[in-house]
Regions:
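Transmembrane beta-barrel strand/turn architecture of Gram-negative outer membrane proteins
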Residues: 221-235
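Short, ordered secondary-structure scaffold segments
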Residues: 49-50, 58-59, 64-82, 87-102, ...
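Short glycine/acidic-enriched loop and turn motifs that connect beta-strands
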Residues: 15, 39, 106, 133-134, ...
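A surface-exposed, glycine/aromatic-enriched loop/edge motif typical of exported proteins
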Residues: 155-166, 171, 250-254, 297
Length: 300
């Protein structure tokens, strides 16, 4: 920490000598930069610019702009954002629910992403969405307990405990008759071929996280830190390692495979799940910047 008690550096160390260090600088009480360093050396530096105390721009090494807020509405919600050569526009209704999300490259008339949404402002449920690029739309309805009852013209039904009995996209029913386990499926009349017949064996840690998952000779094993956060995953088949993945700092991943290694640093966001850009280094040892398009839930 610095003399004012502010975080000045943070190092997260995983297994196998992998680590991620973040060094912070400040200006006017706001974080002005974060430098990322790993076992590979210095990765990059994020620089932040503010207006009236609000973040308005993020740059890489004080050069490449990967996030720039250009417009917001009266509720303080972003309506226009620039990410490099990409323009992102967001629409909202009078309650602040999203109505549209678009991504367009500068100088190009077509959209990389063009989504529309409608929400029930009282129950806050999504009732309609459309992907204009592929001309696909979905309508949703819910019961008085906010459970999904229809989607894409299909129906879902529930028992008194809230268990799903039928789903329109699956031919068959589900039963929950195991004594002492009212929410565990005891049987299903789903047709053969819809559900996998492969046996999957899962073991757990003392803090109820998966320790290993085995299926068809494939084994995925997991390692956690003292905060019960996953820091390593290893996938193997027949004793041969297929993939080792390390997770660090909520923003850095390392993939090691027999064919080569890859590093990914997620940027312009709080963590993996809301970052709008990712810096990737593959086996050629060169870094490339990619931008991420997400829906309103954060899914890519």
């Amino acid at each position: 920490y610095d003399a004012l008690g502010r975080l000045s550096s943070q190092t997260e160390t995983a297994v196998d000598n992998k680590y991620l260090r973040k060094d912070y600088t400040y200006n006017g009480g706001n974080v002005s930069s974060i430098k990322y360093t790993s076992q590979s050396g210095v990765l990059t530096t994020e620089n932040y610019n503010y207006a009236n105390g609000h973040l308005v721009e993020t740059k890489l090494n004080n050069q490449t702009s990967i996030f720039k807020l250009t417009k917001e509405n009266d509720m303080g919600l972003p309506t226009e954002v620039r990410s490099g050569a990409l323009s992102r526009t967001y629409g909202y209704d009078s309650y602040g629910f999203p109505t549209s999300r678009k991504i367009q490259k500068t100088g190009v008339t077509t959209f990389l992403q063009n989504m529309e949404y409608v929400f029930d402002p009282v129950k806050r449920n999504l009732t309609y969405r459309k992907d204009i690029n592929v001309s696909q739309e979905e309508k949703f309805s819910y019961d008085n307990l906010n459970r999904l009852t229809s989607y894409k013209g299909l129906m879902a039904t529930y028992d008194a405990k809230g268990n799903i009995l039928t789903k329109g996209d699956v031919s068959g029913t589900f039963a929950y008759n195991t004594s002492g386990k009212p929410y565990a499926i005891s049987s299903s009349s789903v047709a053969n071929g819809i559900m996998s017949s492969a046996t999957q064996v899962i073991s757990y840690t003392s803090f109820k996280r998966p320790n290993a998952i085995t299926q068809d000779g494939n084994v995925a094993s997991f390692t956690y830190n003292g905060n019960q956060q996953r820091v390593k995953m290893q996938v193997a088949k027949g004793g041969s390692r297929l993939l080792t993945r390390y997770y660090l700092g909520d923003c850095y991943e390392i993939d090691e495979t027999p064919s080569g290694n890859k590093e990914k640093l997620y940027l312009a966001g709080e963590n993996y799940y809301d970052a709008s850009a990712v810096l990737v280094k593959d086996h050629t040892n060169s870094w490339k910047l990619y931008y991420i398009g997400r829906d309103y839930l954060g899914s890519i």
